[in-house]
Design a protein with these regions (language model features):
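N-terminal strand-loop element at the rim of the active site
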Residues: 5-64
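Conserved donor-binding/catalytic core segment of Leloir-type glycosyltransferases
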Residues: 4, 132, 164-193, 204, ...
Length: 348
C-alpha cells in the first residue's frame, strides 16, 4: 500500500507535523510505502526541531513550495491512498482527477465567511472521500448532521508519561503561548484575587510570547506572590513540570479546536481547570472543572475550590481523569484499517 501524506507546514515541529509523522511512522512500521509532503505556508522558516525529526525517518519527506501543483499531482499518482491534513483543494482535486481515494484530517473549526481560503477548504472537504475531525466542536462546525463520510479522531502523537507521586505535587501550571486570548492575563488576575495560600499553591507559567513584558509588569505592579516563571524549557523538562503540578489551568477565549495541553496533563494524571471554549472541555474530560472564558471571578473561585479538596478526593479525581482519557484516545493502527476500507470502496 502506497500512502501519501500532505500537510501545510510553517517549518517548526508543531502539533500537526508531529501527528503527520506519527501516523506515517505507524504505517511504515506495518510495511506500507510512505511519502510525506510538507507544503510551505506564508512565513515558512525551517526550524531545527523539524529538521531533526525528519533526519531520523527512513521514508521520503519533502518540502514543496506553494503552488507546486506538479509535484502534488505526481505524488498523488504514485499513491494508493492520499491523506490530507486540512482540506487542501489542490490535493483533493488531484486525487479526484486520478481516481485515488482521499481522506482528510481536519484540525480547525469551519469559518463560514466568504474569504477565499475558507470557501476553498469547504469545497475540498465536500469532495473528499472521508473526513476525520479532531474534536466534536470542530466536527459540528463542519458537519452538524454527522454524515457517514465523517468521523472524529483526536490527534495525538506523543504524550508525556512520567507520573509524579501525588505527595510530591504542588500548585497550578499554565502551559500555553503568552499571547492574547490564551488567558494568561485572566489567570494572573484570578490567582491574585483568590483567597489561597500562595506558598502552598504556587502558579508556574511555562512558555513565552509577545505578552512577556506585560505579564512581568503585571506581576510586579500588583505584587502577585507565588508565581514562578521557568522560561522556555526543553520538552522533557516541560513535561516534568506539568507532572509536578496538582492542576493544569487552561483558560483561553479563542475557540480552541481541541486543547492538547489538557490531554498532556491528563496523561500524567493531572486534572484540569478550563474555560468553556471550543473543544477544550472535551479535551479536559468530564472530571475537569470549568468556567466561562474571561470570567476572572469564576476562575478565582475554582482555584479556591480545588485548594480545599481533600487529598483522598484529589487522588480519585486524578485517577478518573486519566482512565477516561485512555478510552477517549484511539490507537494509530485505526488509520491502516480505514485506508483499507476506502481503497476497497474504489475497487468495487
Amino acid at each position: 500500500m502506497n500512502i501519501l501524506y500532505i500537510s501545510p507546514c510553517q517549518g517548526a515541529f508543531g502539533g500537526i507535523e508531529a501527528f503527520v509523522l506519527a501516523v506515517a511512522d505507524e504505517l511504515y512500521s506495518c510495511g506500507a510505502s510512505v511519502q510525506v509532503l510538507f507544503k510551505k505556508v506564508k512565513g515558512f522558516q525551517l526550524k531545527d526541531s523539524l529538521q531533526q525529526a525528519i533526519q531520523i525517518r527512513r521514508y521520503p519527506i519533502r518540502f514543496i513550495a506553494r503552488g507546486d501543483f506538479a509535484t502534488i499531482f505526481r505524488s498523488v499518482k504514485w499513491a494508493d491512498v492520499v491523506h490530507g491534513h486540512n482540506p487542501l483543494l489542490e490535493v483533493v482535486v488531484s486525487a479526484l482527477w486520478l481516481r485515488k481515494p482521499c481522506v482528510l484530517t481536519v484540525y480547525n473549526w469551519c469559518r463560514k465567511n466568504l474569504h477565499p481560503r475558507p470557501v476553498l477548504w469547504r469545497v475540498a472537504n465536500k469532495l473528499a472521500d472521508h473526513s476525520w475531525y479532531i474534536s466534536d466542536f470542530v466536527w459540528n462546525t463542519w458537519d452538524d448532521k454527522r454524515q457517514d463520510k465523517s468521523g472524529k479522531l483526536p490527534i495525538v502523537s506523543s504524550l508525556p508519561s512520567r507520573v509524579t507521586p501525588y505527595k510530591d505535587r504542588a500548585g497550578f501550571i499554565f502551559a500555553s503561548r503568552w499571547i492574547p486570548n490564551k488567558g494568561i492575563r485572566t489567570l494572573l488576575q484570578a490567582y491574585s484575587m483568590s483567597n489561597i495560600d500562595k506558598s502552598k499553591w504556587p502558579l508556574v507559567l511555562l512558555g513565552d510570547g509577545p505578552l512577556r513584558e506585560e505579564v512581568l509588569a503585571m506581576i510586579e505592579r500588583d505584587g502577585i506572590h507565588g508565581v514562578e516563571i521557568p522560561g522556555f524549557l526543553p520538552d522533557h523538562e516541560r513535561n516534568l513540570k506539568i507532572s509536578q503540578a496538582k492542576w493544569m489551568i487552561t483558560p483561553p477565549k479563542t475557540n480552541e479546536d481541541l486543547g492538547l495541553t489538557a490531554i498532556e496533563a491528563r496523561n500524567v494524571k493531572v486534572p484540569c481547570i478550563v474555560t468553556h471554549d471550543g473543544g477544550l472541555p472535551e479535551a479536559a474530560g468530564k472530571f475537569s472543572l470549568s468556567c466561562q472564558p474571561g470570567n476572572i471571578v469564576e476562575l478565582a473561585e475554582l482555584l479556591e475550590t480545588v485548594s480545599l479538596i481533600s487529598e483522598e478526593d484529589y487522588i480519585q479525581l486524578a485517577e478518573n481523569t486519566y482512565f477516561q482519557l485512555r478510552s477517549y484516545l484511539k490507537p494509530l493502527n485505526l488509520y491502516r484499517q480505514a485506508y483499507q476500507v476506502v481503497i476497497r470502496s474504489y475497487q468495487e
